Amino acid sequence: MTDVWRLAIFVLMVNVLNDQVSCSGPPGPVGYPGVPGVPGPRGPPGQPGAAGRPGDPGPKGPSVKCPCRERSAFTVKFSGRLPPPSEPVVFTEVLYNTQRDLKESTGVFNCVEPGNYHFSFDVELYHCKVKIGLMKNHIQVMEKHQLSKNEYENASGAMIMPLRQGDKVWLEADVETEEPDQAKVVIYFSGFLISS
């Protein structure tokens, strides 16, 4: 009899436990948000973005008129009869002298705009001996010699010199020959302002 009761109580307990496990009530209300976690580590760099579109054109700048003037320059040529010695060579042909800083009647360059000038000369001679000098304010600053007998010869020189307003520059040529009828001399003389 005791065993029967024990079995009945055991079966009853099992049924009660099964009812408790299989039965659940309705869902409860949503809980409060939890505390935020700590920030995670920095991620790797992303890929470069696409190029942006070109910006709008800027406003047009102001127009400025350059106050520049033409720089002093000349090129002249001498040919024909032999020039007199120890005097400025008076040139027979003007190739360029727009600013008229070289006085064509005297062959003398007069500095109007102070600055650094480049002067050069080239002499072609035949059957004669030539000494040519570059002069500045009656002082010789360069001298070249050349001798020609039975063929054409050349002599040339160039120099950069600073000039002040009113300074004067010219060429002088001393020509010696035993055959004046055959002797020939052609001289080119150039100068121009490099910087002021």
From Swiss-Prot:
GO terms for cellular component: collagen trimer; extracellular region. Residues 67-196 form the C1q domain. GO terms for biological process: hibernation. Residues 1-23 form the signal peptide. Pfam families: C1q (PF00386), Collagen (PF01391). Residues 28-47 have a biased composition (Pro residues). It comes from the Eukaryota. InterPro entries: C1q_dom, Collagen, Collagen/C1q_domain, Tumour_necrosis_fac-like_dom. Residues 28-64 are annotated as: Disordered. Residues 25-63 form the Collagen-like domain. Keywords: Collagen, Hibernation, Secreted, Signal. The keyword Secreted applies. Plasma; synthesized in the liver. Its main location: secreted. It is found in: Secreted. Plasma proteins HP-20, HP-25, HP-27 and HP-55 form a 140 kDa complex via disulfide bonds in the plasma and are hibernation specific. This is Hibernation-associated plasma protein HP-20. It comes from Tamias sibiricus.
